[in-house]
UniProtKB/Swiss-Prot annotation:
Originating species: Rhizobium rhizogenes (strain K84 / ATCC BAA-868) (Agrobacterium radiobacter)
Function recorded in the entry: Catalyzes amidations at positions B, D, E, and G on adenosylcobyrinic A,C-diamide. NH(2) groups are provided by glutamine, and one molecule of ATP is hydrogenolyzed for each amidation.
Domain GATase cobBQ-type: 251-438
Gene expressing this chain: cobQ
Listed CDD domains: CobQ_N, GATase1_CobQ
Lineage: Bacteria, Pseudomonadati, Pseudomonadota, Alphaproteobacteria, Hyphomicrobiales
Catalytic-site annotation from UniProt: 333 (nucleophile), 430
Protein name per Swiss-Prot or TrEMBL: Cobyric acid synthase
Gene3D superfamilies: 3.40.50.880, P-loop containing nucleotide triphosphate hydrolases
MF GO annotations: ABC-type vitamin B12 transporter activity; catalytic activity
Length: 484
């Protein structure tokens, strides 16, 4: 019989995603057939699953950790926040609808069937499913109709382990407070807890374990230290961008403006990992650095809205000055659309603004259309004759004279555009910097000739290191009970 366990948190960003990924790799290394599952995720960081639809990139990473093909059933409900139109709702990989926050609460019961169907699909033919909750089960104002935490756990009869983040402080109060605020029906689902992100001498927390046990009766399944290897994994949420280093001593400075609805920002992770690259995420209120050699406009869930915000920050003037100095610009997906002369949205897909001027750096125009392109792709860089692999997730069609100079050829068809002087490039392909050969040639064009890392291998190594650390600190009897 397939076993299942669910990790829920005392709050957001307590480390559930990394723990699920680490446990998936731990059990995969033991020969256990394991799969990840997250009933509901909210993120503009999406991936294209191998069966052809959208899921959160966190679940894609967890499938990599489990050494199984990714599937839309690993994340049956994905909410992608937009601008004034609320969130786009993806169900089992496909666009299901749009809703604002209050409206979505009323829609959740309609989605429970799809969630349970996907969970049954994930359980079939496997030994263990590791489920990740969202936010905190203690948000009792959202409990009615819940499909992300205890609402799912009680319906699917999946036991829960609570994760508390000691690094942010107040972990005892968070765990004990969750116990007291939950109704008895939900409390009965919890089988223990894990303390995450611990720094220092674990023995000093002994009285803390006694206190938590005294208040709740829950056993502690382990105290997990701060996992340094987690920093080498692609980040899941844009909130992580606030904590990333604001640059290093790398020879090439690359500037990325952090747009309000930035999407798929893990595109930049391979560049961040290169020691001779100084990757700077530019926040609201900051100027784009004048000494940057390259500016990259990221993907966006709301191209027109983010383009208007980019102008409000004055970044359009910074980018124009950058190009006049001979600087280069790359636009990815929504960032590519922003580089053109105009962005049209006659159907109001993104909102009430039906068109806005682009930055005018490429002689192209984009028209939003309801059909969404979602696919994994192999490609070739026309500029560097380098192989690429990545994925496309976008609305809209881009046309214009500069498309006669495509930046890439994706599955045999031209994609993207380049300016006549070669300074400006746009593409719809996400993940291009993960391709080691392309990244090496791009950096070499800036005079960086150092040996390049194998990015995929570095992620695999990080997952193995996390699995090894978890095996050393988590309760062996608890792990064995899940493996057996």
């Amino acid at each position: 019989m397939t076993k299942a366990i669910m990790l829920q948190g005392t709050g957001s960003d307590v480390g559930k995603t990394v723990l699920v990924a680490g446990l998936c790799r731990l059990f995969a290394n033991r020969g256990v057939r394991v799969r990840p599952f997250k009933p509901q995720n909210m993120s503009n960081n999406a991936a294209v699953a191998e069966d052809g639809g959208e899921i959160g990139r966190a679940q894609w990473l967890q499938s990599l950790a489990a050494r199984v093909p990714s599937s839309v059933h690993m994340n049956p409900v994905l909410l992608k926040p937009q601008s004034e139109t609320g969130s786009q709702i993806i169900v089992q990989g496909k666009v299901w609808g749009h809703a604002k926050g209050r409206d979505y609460q009323a829609l959740k019961p309609q989605l429970l069937g799809a969630v349970l169907e996907s969970f049954a699909t994930m359980r079939a033919g496997t030994d263990l499913v590791i489920v990740e909750g969202a936010g905190s089960p203690a948000e009792i104002n959202l409990r009615q109709g819940d499909i992300a935490n205890m609402g799912f756990a009680t319906r699917a009869n999946v036991p829960v382990v609570l994760v508390g983040d000691i690094d942010r402080g107040g972990v005892i109060a968070s765990l004990v407070g969750t116990y007291h605020i939950l109704p008895e029906e939900d409390r009965r689902m919890i089988r223990g807890y894990i303390i995450n992100k611990f720094r220092g001498d674990v023995s000093l927390f002994g009285t803390g374990i006694e206190a938590i046990g005294g208040f709740t009766g829950w056993p502690c399944h382990g105290i997990v230290p701060w996992l340094k290897a987690a920093g080498r994994l692609p980040p899941e949420d844009s909130v992580v961008l606030e904590r990333l280093a604001r640059g290093s001593d790398g020879a090439l400075k690359i500037a990325v403006p952090v747009l309000p609805r930035i999407a798929n920002f893990d595109d930049f992770d391979p560049l961040r990992a290169e020691p001779d690259v100084d990757l700077v995420f530019v926040r609201a209120g900051e100027r784009l650095p004048a000494d940057a050699g390259l500016v990259i406009l990221p993907g966006s869930k709301s191209t027109i809205g983010d383009l208007m915000d980019l102008r409000a920050q004055g970044w359009d003037r910074d980018i124009t000055a950058h190009v006049r100095r001979g600087g280069r610009v790359i636009g990815i997906c929504g960032g590519y659309q922003m580089l053109g002369r105009m962005v049209h949205d006659p159907l109001g897909i993104e909102g009430s603004v039906t068109e806005t001027p682009g930055l005018g750096l490429l002689d192209v125009e984009t028209e939003m259309a309801p059909e969404k392109t979602v696919r994994n792709s192999t490609a070739l860089s026309t500029e560097y004759d380098a192989p690429l692999s990545g994925y496309e997730i976008h609305l809209g069609v881009t046309r214009g004279k500069d498309c006669d100079r495509p930046s890439t050829v994706i599955d045999g068809r031209p994609d993207g555009a380049r300016s006549g002087d070669g300074l400006i490039m746009g593409t719809y392909l996400h993940g291009l910097f993960c391709s080691d050969a392309y990244r090496a040639k791009l950096l070499a064009s800036f005079g960086l000739s150092g040996e390049r890392m194998d990015y995929r291998a570095s992620v695999e190594t990080a997952l193995d290191e996390i699995a090894t650390e978890l095996e050393a600190v988590l309760d062996p009897a608890w792990l064995d009970s899940l493996a057996g």
